[in-house]
Amino acid sequence: ATDSEQLAYLSSTVGGERIYLDRDLVEADLTITVGEIAFDPVMGIRGTNSVLYPGLSNVEAIAKAHGQGHLELGPNDERALRQMVDEIGWLLGVQFTVQVLAGEGTSASEIFAGLDTSICNAGREALFEKSMVTSPERAEIVLIAIDQDCAGHQWNQLGAALATARSLVAKGGKVIVLSELAMEPGDGINLIRESRQARDALKPLRQQSPPDLIPATQIASIVDWAEVYLLSKLDSTLVDELFMIPLESVESVDRLLRVGDSTLFIAGGQHTFGEIAPPN
């Protein structure tokens, strides 16, 4: 968020929202956005103008945009926040952008530079081609690996990978997550630990809206749907308290894979989006 004294009024959106942004941005002669094109649980697809808002606005804008995501919507479905950030980019006069598509580990798969609209379309097409996971039916077992990307291993990556698995695994099936997560849990994650059942945490998560609202919601949603086995560097007691089953070694993963009629393997799970193909 930008300090209130450094904010300047840009304009009002079609919906009547008064937009305040960093003064240097509003008064700049030329603005070039730089960011990552990626799937996003709130916006559908993050990139181009989403780097501007709400991050470079005030605390109120950030709080208003902070949500649990939309499990029922796909990345191509219309999202009010995504429409707003694109309108803000237009109001600001942004025309040129540089965007990156994540590759394996800390590498970039593709880099795009050019006019905002054309890069948005090209990046979206590349993202779907590289990172959309489509299955004809739900699998009994989903094994999903999380790479160490530029952000390291954080709860956000775990949550994103679990959201993909939630879309692809059968009810009561098994999800096996390979991660090196060792990060301390945030307030939202701790709400799950304090609950008798994972789904009991969803309402207080909405009410309190902690900084880790999204990954906490993603975790609470999947452990109520399937058995989740986690290989990580977290303490096994913490994993148990999150209603997941801790794995101590790769050998434990091998044993789990011997059971089950159908298994889906996904690499770089934090960058993906899962969907079941519509019937013909």
PLM features: residue spans?
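Glycine/threonine-rich flexible loop motifs
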Residues: 42-49, 152-157, 274-275
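Extended hydrophobic packing segments that form well-structured cores
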Residues: 232-280
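Conserved, well-structured core segments that form the ligand-binding/active-site neighborhood
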Residues: 1-13, 17-138
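Glycine-rich, anion-gripping cofactor-binding loops and their flanking helix/strand elements
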Residues: 1-27, 152-160, 202-223, 234, ...
